[in-house]
Swiss-Prot record:
This is Antimicrobial peptide 2. Disulfide bonds. Transmembrane segments: none annotated. The lineage of its organism: Eukaryota, Viridiplantae, Streptophyta, Embryophyta, Tracheophyta. The keyword Disulfide bond applies. It comes from the Eukaryota. Keywords: Antibiotic, Antimicrobial, Disulfide bond, Fungicide. GO terms for biological process: defense response to fungus; defense response to Gram-negative bacterium; defense response to Gram-positive bacterium; killing of cells of another organism. Antimicrobial peptide. Active against fungal species B.cinerea (IC(50)=5.2 uM), A.niger (IC(50)=2.6 uM) and B.sorokinina (IC(50)=5.2 uM) but not against F.oxysporum, F.graminearum and P.debaryanum at concentrations below 10 uM. Inhibits growth of P.infestans at concentration between 1.3 uM and 5.2 uM. Active against bacterial species P.syringae, B.subtilis, X.campestris and C.michiganense. Expressed in flowers but not in leaves, seeds or roots (at protein level).
Length: 44
């Protein structure tokens, strides 16, 4: 697994986490476990 981390800078920036199946979106802190979802979802 992995841990959702949102301590990077920027507003509303979607960043992929070190784990290939994790990504987070700011500012709503939505985490996705599916890489395809990470790539297709627009950042809030």
């Amino acid at each position: 697994g992995g841990k959702c981390t949102v301590d990077w800078g920027g507003q509303g920036g979607g960043r992929r986490l070190p784990s290939p199946l994790f990504c987070c979106y700011k500012p709503t802190r939505i985490c996705y476990l599916n890489q395809e979802t990470c790539e297709t979802e627009t950042c809030p």
